[in-house]
Amino acid sequence: MKRVLAVFFTIMFMLGTDTFLISPLLPTLQQVYHVSTELSGWMVSSYALGYAGFALIAGPISDGLNRKKLMVLGMSFFALSTFLCGMAPSFLWMLTFRFLAGVSAAFVSPQVWASIPLLIEKKQIVKAIGIATAGLSISQILGLPIGAYLATIHYTTPFFVIGILSALLVVLIYVVLPEIQPVHIGGSKTNILKRYKQLLTDSKVSLSYFAYFVFQTGNFAAFSFFGVWLSIQFGLQVHEIGTAMLVLGLGNLTGNIFGPRIVNKIGYNLSFYGGIVFTAVLYVLLPHVKNIIFVELLFFVLFFVTGILFVLMMGRLQNMSSIARGTGAALANASMYIGQMIGAAIAGMLFAASHNFILVGSFTALLYIGALFLFRKSEKLSEDSETGIAS
């Protein structure tokens, strides 16, 4: 189990590093390609668009295929497309290669979440999800700032390094992971639309996924323009932005690790709903902080709580379907990346209009509160359903 989890951790680390890498590089890439602030956000959104669009297809398809083979194939194309980002001669080519990297990642990430319940003992599933999530967090702590430091050599260097390391990871996946055959139900195959219909017919399930989408839209609206904000308001260079992001990632990882203990101590509702309200308030306050030390302190606290929330949300969504886990994992990931695409695009317009982080922070806070009400409505429907069955 340890070797399998190590591979899952490494996969999420590589995907996370590539996903989050663009944020601290945006000011540099904006100058390289001579594009406006509004357009620069599409270097984030193009990856998200490729991921979101194809995750919706990849998830249901993967429920009928060998997940190991999909991971090998997807990671191979991910390595190639990321490497090519470093060779992009123009803004449009960069968008194209980022889009293809997102498409490739769409065939890999859902397999990790869907394979955990199949390969890991039931009592260890939450822990395993936390370990995989920690891969994303550590990509912010180490991968993201290291990428920013590599960019001081040349802005293309991080893409080349990630591409080569991802190619080596393909070999590790092939050697370590067992064959993960599909679970056939009733001997018949279900088409893609029917899989989503089966999953989303239940209103409490569809509400939860929509709430997750709303939350991630707000999350990535803020995250995508942290680098631009730090560059403009505090005059930070790319490696200094990477250091600031290190603090952010450290908070996320700490939340992933200590989250289960905190939830057990203070209860699910306070951890989940209280955490959403708390982060919403901090996003409103963040733009008004003028000292970079206090900004980094708020980064740590914000993403410490977000790290807890992410584990709780993924556990909640994965428990909603024991049959179409690939479809559910794909829908969760697609929701996140569609949110990233829309959030980054809107944040670009808001930041360009205000030239500060106030509108972006308020937008994120508003969406967090909206997500809270949607999650609570979903939970209420679930409680009503259980009451009806009991009676």
Map each language-model feature to its residues.
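C-terminal transmembrane helical hairpin of 12-TM major facilitator-type secondary transporters
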Residues: 269-313
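Helix-loop-helix hairpin linking two adjacent transmembrane segments in secondary transporters
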Residues: 131-174
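Cytoplasmic helix-loop-helix junction between adjacent transmembrane helices
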Residues: 97-138
